[in-house]
Amino acid sequence: MAELKFKTKAQNLKNLQTKLKKAKVLPLVLTSLEELISNEDKVLQDIQTLKANRLIIRSSSLSEDSMKNSNAGAFLSLANIKADSKDELLKALYEVANSMPSKSDEILVQPMLENITLCGVGFSVDKDNFSPYFCLQYDENGSNSSITDGSSKSAKTYYHYRNYLEFKDIRLQKIIELIKELEVLYDCHFLDVEFAFAIQDDKEELFCLQVRPLVMHEKNNLFHSLPKEALYRFYKRFESLKESRSRVLGDKAIFGVMPDWNPAEIIGLRPKRLAFSLYKEIITDNIWAYQRDNYGYRDLRSHPLIHSFLGIPYVDVRLSFNSFIPKKLDENIAQKLVNFYLDKLNKNHELHDKIEFNIVYSCYDFNSSKKLEELLNHGFNENEIKRLEFSLLELTNKIINPRSGFYLKDIQKAYKLKERYDGIINSNFSLIDKIYWLIEECKRYGTLPFAGVARAAFVAMQLLNSLVEIDFITKEEKDDFLNSLNTVSKNLSKQTNHLNFHNKDQFLKDFGHLRAGTYNILSPRYDEDFELYFDADQKDSKVYLQDKAFVFSKEKTRALNALLKEHGLEINACEFFDFLKQAIEGRELVKFEFTRLLSKAIVYIEELGKYYDIEKEDLAHLDIKSILNLYSSLYSINPKEQFIEEINRNKKEYELTQAIKLPSLLCNADEIFSFYNHSIIPNFITQKSITAFTAKENDKDLEGKIVLIYAADPGYDYLFTKNIAGLITCYGGANSHMAIRASELGMPAVIGVGEENFEKYLKAKKINIECESEQIFCL
């Protein structure tokens, strides 16, 4: 039985004054507008009994803090009111009173808490799905409101699994013990608690500033969906993965959701089983390592890049770092290098989506000598650095070779995809056989070459960027070159720019296979839901495209030839620009072509579901291997029964995936149970500023608005045809598709702001993006 029942904010605190053991409650006076009007002097006398210099006057309405509606922040609260100024005090009392709907609504008066050392808000569960974590957000800047009003610049967010009893910070332990005590007093596991630590009489004390129930209306309740046994199994698995595997160097295991093949961006943080298994099948289980090996890096075949940790996709970062080491580099230097990378990332978590730019040396460029100097401060001698530099140069020359560069063969392979595609879809194969061969051909002629061309394109961008770094070309010249390229996405933008009912069929023939979520069966193709993506009646879009040839002067060409020779790059200026163009355009071309096969395979999976009377929403939970196995294995059990049994099991597992909370970068096993959410540094595109209303991707009216989308997925390219003002993505790195496209189009965008910031921006009606100063303001 509960000792206390939830009432108003003021009544809750009043009742807690004599009950609460784990924290203090400040003295308080309750009044109302009715009482103020009838007996103003008595109210003022009562307030003087608080013996405070400054006061905080807060609303305490019956329509606040209930089980059905929190109305958080709906009514007025005024802080730092002088207790000895009658006029100021009365003015504040009436202002707070008049902000509430009823004359009988309470006004809560308390002393201002001084000498605050830590202040924040704690939830006893996740506020959105009630998963079993204590979620604390706090600030140590001395403010009593920086967390609640969103003004904090140094807020910390801490998650702690409810059944985990170990703590590293005594203050966080005390806050959680306070929340647990409140749970017992109110017999309620779903609480929102405001707290503060402050120095009183030379001692730091914990204060409970407010408690209210979390509103549960129409929310998914995952409170019982995460058994501790699952987390302890995960803990043991992580511990075992610390041991280095065959051919893998490095002393520390780190896993992340955004490095390298960036699953958070491509399939999301909590993908359903079909999307996750497709990504693993066609790229991250085997294909990725084959191409790194082919392109001159360490042979890591048979090592899967991505692990599923209770349904969340994590890249093995140590393995990834190994895969960027030239295979001819001395083993001892390679070992030191991997450990240097791991240590740098461990100390700079914000770089986890920028490892190829800010951590690893994966190719030679015009600024390599200067960049490699940092290794002198980390235990490398000049001889080791020179050997690394030479290895990178040798590898880069192999990649960019205009006659034998692997990327040229890979681009040619992609041209076979159309023939393979037509052969399969026009065959008399069963649905299962068609799915099998689409996936197989997608791997052989699609994702295998794509992994290679994507690597070549990265090398191309690194070389191009380094020309800017050494002031050989300007940033504007770099942008002019990129804008001169004839990419698939540029062609898509041109086509949609003039899209109408007359050319709609041809447009869908060319681009209809694209979908916003490339691997997601629940994301419709362009040709399945045209109206969702496009408006055939739209006027020509003001797309930021400038079609002009890039011209390099003869003098500049001669200088580039000399520069290439000076750096030992075995290519001339014309061949150099041909490489940049072919690699960057080729990356988009190969991806565009392989997604045609993948997208059709997903269509056939949907048809297979219809045949077996299984809904698309359920098919999203089916592992692709369960379908592929049926190509060469016949079982006594009917495939429908087999699928449904697995779907039900995976659905249950997915509840656990939704409930679990993990850091974006997992460096230590104990972070499985408790961790801080580290700050994320977003990627600002262009130097422009823009102020506009916000819109979500599915809103009908996007013109002139800043659009917010979760992933920087290429399928969202259609947004650029909607005359949008700007773009913000939750996930995505500096090298993501949308970052590149926004840069090409000169559109202000912020890529990869992180979950916490993204949720804040979703609530803003209007946003100001200042790309030059790298700031975002909610207006």
From Swiss-Prot:
A UniProt-annotated Pfam family: PEP-utilizers
Enzyme Commission designation: 2.7.3.13
InterPro entries, sorted: ATP_grasp_subdomain_1, PEP-util_enz_mobile_dom, PEP_Utilizing_Enz, Phosphohistidine_dom_sf
Pathway named in the protein's UniProt entry: Capsule biogenesis; capsule polysaccharide biosynthesis
Leading EC class: transferase
Record keywords, A-Z: Capsule biogenesis/degradation, Kinase, Transferase
Keyword Hydrolase carried by entry: no
Example GO BP: capsule polysaccharide biosynthetic process
Coiled-coil stretches noted in the UniProt entry, renumbered to this chain: none
Catalytic machinery residues: H737 (nucleophile)
Molecular function terms from GO: ATP binding; kinase activity; phosphotransferase activity, nitrogenous group as acceptor
Knockout-associated phenotype: Mutant does not express the MeOPN CPS modification.
Positions of transmembrane segments: none
Catalytic activity: L-glutamine + ATP + H2O = N(5)-phospho-L-glutamine + AMP + phosphate + 2 H(+)
Comment text on domains: Contains an N-terminal ATP-grasp domain, a specialized central substrate-binding domain for L-glutamine and a C-terminal phospho-histidine domain.
Other comments on record: The reaction mechanism comprises three steps. First, a histidine residue of the enzyme attacks ATP at the beta-phosphoryl group to form AMP and a pyrophosphorylated enzyme intermediate. Next, the pyrophosphorylated enzyme intermediate is hydrolyzed to generate inorganic phosphate and a phosphorylated enzyme intermediate. Finally, the phosphorylated enzyme intermediate transfers the phosphate to the amide nitrogen of the acceptor substrate L-glutamine.
Function: Involved in the biosynthesis of the O-methyl phosphoramidate (MeOPN) group found on the capsular polysaccharide (CPS) of C.jejuni. Catalyzes the ATP-dependent phosphorylation of the amide nitrogen of L-glutamine to form L-glutamine phosphate, the first committed step in MeOPN biosynthesis. Also catalyzes the phosphorylation of D-glutamine, gamma-L-glutamyl hydroxamate, gamma-L-glutamyl-hydrazide and beta-L-aspartyl hydroxamate. Does not phosphorylate L-glutamate or L-asparagine. Does not act on L-glutamine derivatives with removed alpha-amino or alpha-carboxy groups.
PANTHER family assigned: PHOSPHOENOLPYRUVATE SYNTHASE-RELATED, PPDK_N DOMAIN-CONTAINING PROTEIN
Protein name (Swiss-Prot/TrEMBL): L-glutamine kinase
Organism: Campylobacter jejuni subsp. jejuni serotype O:2 (strain ATCC 700819 / NCTC 11168)
Taxonomic placement: Bacteria, Pseudomonadati, Campylobacterota, Epsilonproteobacteria, Campylobacterales
